[in-house]
Amino acid sequence: MAKTMMQDRLINPLEGAADAPDANIRPALLAEYIGQPVVREQMEVFIQAARARDEALDHTLIFGPPGLGKTTLANIIAREMGGNLRSTSGPVLERAGDLAAMLTNLEAGDVLFIDEIHRLSPVIEEILYPAMEDFQLDIMIGEGPAARSIKLDLPPFTLVAATTRAGLLTSPLRDRFGIVQRLEFYNIADLTTIVSRAARLMRVPMSEDGAVEIARRARGTPRIANRLLRRVRDYAQVRGDGSINGAIAGSALDMLAVDRRGLDHLDRRYIEILHERFDGGPAGVEAVAAAMAEDRGTLEDVIEPYLIQQGYVLRTARGRVLTQMAIDQML
């Protein structure tokens, strides 16, 4: 039941089936990419330089909390480099043959996107090393004493990998990425621009204060902002005249129990448990997860990043600690 609650959570930053319409409003080029100014400027330079040399872009690792646009950036890289995007994920690549099939189908300049790369098995990693370094694929032919290794040349390609947990990558894999980019939570101004752009593409009339109200409650995350926009659009259609202003957006999000800080019942429950059961901490993440009937990964990837970024919780060597700001504002 807890897992279902997390999946159905409106401000869950993880991608779900309901987010499929977002594909139609994602930026396709760096010029359309909003926010992340450091990442955008660096990628513009790296991509232009690689294109001028007629080379594949260096392998690129993108990490950060979910919902910030790692997949979008991978698509942009492929489009800017003029190559095809081949997508997969760490959990899907179970056998060596799975990765070998993808690598041998690549063409020069293509981008291979591997999401959740921290979940690759050691066997798959070993195949990736020569593919990334030398554009070669080492495969075994035959079995037993007659087995032999052969090398296949691969066309120059770019591996773009995404992860929410960069610390779980092995050093040999991490060191093979020439470009490493960290995506940060978005500020309200950039999210307001993202929401306004999405509303325009969805043909939803919206005022500036309506966009600001949605952005303020979107937890610094574009995926959540777009999801909230769709629900506010529904509310405006039924309870208003179809247009979104600050009052309509505020009423809609209040109805959905997303407060002005972007927090919902699970955030407040986390804070209350840490305060009441663990006296404000320090408390181990496993203990907090057990008290919430959630798994550790869910807390670390979904609930905690925003609470920590906003200054409500500290992650220390001894465990999680509630800050005075959280006590003053929420308890």
Curated annotation (Swiss-Prot):
Any Gene Ontology CC annotation: Holliday junction resolvase complex
UniProt note: domains: Has 3 domains, the large (RuvB-L) and small ATPase (RuvB-S) domains and the C-terminal head (RuvB-H) domain. The head domain binds DNA, while the ATPase domains jointly bind ATP, ADP or are empty depending on the state of the subunit in the translocation cycle. During a single DNA translocation step the structure of each domain remains the same, but their relative positions change.
Protein task: The RuvA-RuvB-RuvC complex processes Holliday junction (HJ) DNA during genetic recombination and DNA repair, while the RuvA-RuvB complex plays an important role in the rescue of blocked DNA replication forks via replication fork reversal (RFR). RuvA specifically binds to HJ cruciform DNA, conferring on it an open structure. The RuvB hexamer acts as an ATP-dependent pump, pulling dsDNA into and through the RuvAB complex. RuvB forms 2 homohexamers on either side of HJ DNA bound by 1 or 2 RuvA tetramers; 4 subunits per hexamer contact DNA at a time.
EC number: 3.6.4.-
Pfam families xref list: AAA_lid_4, RuvB_C, RuvB_N
Primary localization class, coarse: cytoplasm
Subcellular location: Cytoplasm
Gene3D superfamilies tied to this protein: 1.10.8.60, P-loop containing nucleotide triphosphate hydrolases, Winged helix-like DNA-binding domain superfamily/Winged helix DNA-binding domain
Region (Large ATPase domain (RuvB-L)): 1-186
Source organism of the structure: Psychrobacter cryohalolentis (strain ATCC BAA-1226 / DSM 17306 / VKM B-2378 / K5)
Record: residues binding ATP: 25-26, 67, 70-72, 133-135, 176, 186, 223
Binding partners and assembly: Homohexamer. Forms an RuvA(8)-RuvB(12)-Holliday junction (HJ) complex. HJ DNA is sandwiched between 2 RuvA tetramers; dsDNA enters through RuvA and exits via RuvB. An RuvB hexamer assembles on each DNA strand where it exits the tetramer. Each RuvB hexamer is contacted by two RuvA subunits (via domain III) on 2 adjacent RuvB subunits; this complex drives branch migration. In the full resolvosome a probable DNA-RuvA(4)-RuvB(12)-RuvC(2) complex forms which resolves the HJ.
An example molecular function term from Gene Ontology annotations: four-way junction DNA binding
Protein's name in the database: Holliday junction branch migration complex subunit RuvB
Catalytic activity of the protein: ATP + H2O = ADP + phosphate + H(+)
Family: Belongs to the RuvB family.
UniProt enzyme class: hydrolase
Residues that, per the record, bind DNA: 296, 315, 320
Residue numbers spanned by region Head domain (RuvB-H): 260-331
Presence of keyword Zinc: no
SMART domains: AAA
UniProt keyword Ribonucleoprotein, yes or no: no
